[in-house]
Design a protein with these regions (language model features):
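Glycine-rich Rossmann-fold phosphate-binding loop(s) that bind the pyrophosphate
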Residues: 24-26, 48, 142
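Flavin (FAD/FMN) cofactor-binding and adjacent substrate-gating region
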Residues: 93-144
Length: 378
């Protein structure tokens, strides 16, 4: 994404005003910016980091595909329509990385034991979501897909600023106007950018905007699901041929693959470029580290075989110092979260910022896009 440089106005220049400031240029923030800009709205799209960047929340569903197709038709976004199924995606955007997802596959693993092919009828499950490859769902390599959608938003007229976050914001309820100070990660205090916006959209994810004075604390105590994860992107993950049987309706690797353990489960999402997203999900009481991930894999022989040639390639920059180029797995102690409110005077949160439960069954993309649908039509 080619980010523009906004400067603070001089004494004789007016402060630049936008209809919408969208904080967060992930897929949901960028998709909303694309729609709004295509309808002639002035949109400022900011993000604290830069594209392309690592992210999870990578597996689509029939509901997500339906909503993408609906948005493409509803708002005349012909460039969006191919993302609604794997066949059209590969035909029109081979450079935007995805993976084939025919459905969901589940395999039970016992500690210290190989998966027994003779027990697969009772110890595995395949759930078909499409009848053929061409119409299948997709896994999204978010570094590629998010950048594509952000670029589409910019081409439609949105103004992008990267490596920048909101430093302070004040809402005038009488004018229905935000006065916002933006601070670049590369700037020192005193070089802030001043802008105004009618609406502030929170698409930042778990960070939220409470740090700038919006009273919207977390309210997660009631949630029954309390899980955390350790995850990353690997090359060299082997196919799970050990679990293939002739009567399978599709290959279990062409799916959101769930390896079910006694203590939790491991996801595997295979992209067409040889990268596989792998993550271990367990209750919040479990240990959370890269070493714990590998110990769990090694204690399940069939998983150890799958990962014997695997090499971690992302994320990069989590290890201190931040400039370190060595990849290290991301660790989240608790993924399940919820904010008190989804909206307030002059601001709205997209679902990605309001709350999240768990990656099980791949609900995240569809949930986020449903919020885009609602806001675009509001």
């Amino acid at each position: 994404m080619h980010a523009v440089e906004l400067s603070s106005p001089s004494v004789n220049q007016p402060i630049r005003r936008f209809d919408f400031l969208i904080a967060g240029s992930g897929f949901s923030g960028s998709l909303l910016a694309w729609i709004l800009a295509s309808q002639g709205r002035s949109v400022l799209l900011i993000d604290r980091s830069r594209h392309p960047r690592f992210a999870v929340g990578e597996s689509s569903t029939p509901t997500a595909d339906f909503l993408l197709a609906y948005l493409a038709e509803r708002w005349g976004l012909k460039q969006l329509a191919p993302l609604a199924c794997w066949g059209q995606w590969k035909k029109h955007y081979p450079h935007v990385v995805c993976g084939k997802k025919r459905g969901f596959s589940y395999y039970h693993h016992s500690h210290g034991r190989e998966v027994d092919p003779s027990s697969l009828e009772t110890q595995s499950l395949l759930v078909a979501a499409s009848s053929q490859d061409a119409w299948s769902d997709t896994h999204w390599l978010r570094s590629s897909v998010d950048e594509f959608l952000a670029n589409q938003a910019c081409s439609a007229g949105a103004t992008p600023i990267e490596s920048t976050q909101i430093h302070s914001a004040l809402f005038d309820p009488f004018e229905h106007r935000w006065s916002i100070s933006l601070r670049s990660a590369n700037e020192t205090p005193g070089a802030d950018i001043q802008v105004q916006a009618t609406w502030l959209i929170d698409a930042t994810g778990h960070q939220g905007l409470s740090s700038i004075g919006i009273d919207n604390p977390e309210d997660s105590h009631w949630m029954r699901t309390r899980t955390g994860a350790v995850y990353g992107h690997f090359v060299g993950v082997d196919p799970f041929t050990q679990a293939a049987i002739p009567q399978d309706p599709f290959c279990g690797d062409d799916a959101a693959q769930h390896h079910v353990l006694d203590t939790g489960w491991i996801w595997m999402l295979r992209f067409d470029n040889g990268v596989t997203s792998v993550g271990l999900v367990e209750p919040t009481s479990a240990a959370r580290s890269q070493d714990h991930f590998w110990k769990t894999v090694q204690s399940h022989p069939s998983l150890a075989r799958l990962m014997r040639n695997a090499k971690l390639v992302a994320p990069i920059g989590l290890k201190q110092p931040a400039t370190c180029s060595e990849p290290v797995m991301a660790c989240v102690d608790r993924m399940s979260r919820c904010r008190t409110r989804a909206w307030g005077p002059g601001w709205v949160s997209l679902p990605v910022s309001y709350g999240f439960i768990d990656p099980l069954h791949s609900t995240g993309i569809a949930h986020s896009i449903s919020g885009v649908v609602r806001l675009a039509e509001a």
